[in-house]
Amino acid sequence: METLPGLLQRPDPGALSAAQLEQLRKFKIQTRIANEKYLRTHKEVEWLISGFFREIFLKRPDNILEFAADYFTDPRLPNKIHMQLIKDKKAA
C-alpha cells in the first residue's frame, strides 16, 4: 500500500474478495439505516447539532475547536436542549 502524507494509506482495491465487498456493502447499508433510526428517535441530537451550527454561523469564531469545546461543555447546554424538547412537544 502506498503511504500518503500524514501516514494515511490508500485503500487496496484488491484486498477484499467479491464476497467480502458484498458483505461490506450490506454492513454499510445496515449501519446507515440504524443511524437514521437512531437520529429520528433522538430529537436532542438534532437540537445539539443545529444549535451548534447556528452559534457558529452567528458568532463566526476564529478558533472552531476551542469554540466547540466551550459549546459542548457549557453546563447550561443540557437545560437548553431540555427546554427545546419541551417546546417541540407543546408545538406538536
UniProtKB/Swiss-Prot annotation:
InterPro entries: cAMP_dep_PK_reg_su_I/II_a/b. Residues 43-77 form the RIIa domain. CDD domains: DD_RIIAD1. SUPFAM superfamilies: Dimerization-anchoring domain of cAMP-dependent PK regulatory subunit. This is RIIa domain-containing protein 1. The gene is RIIAD1.
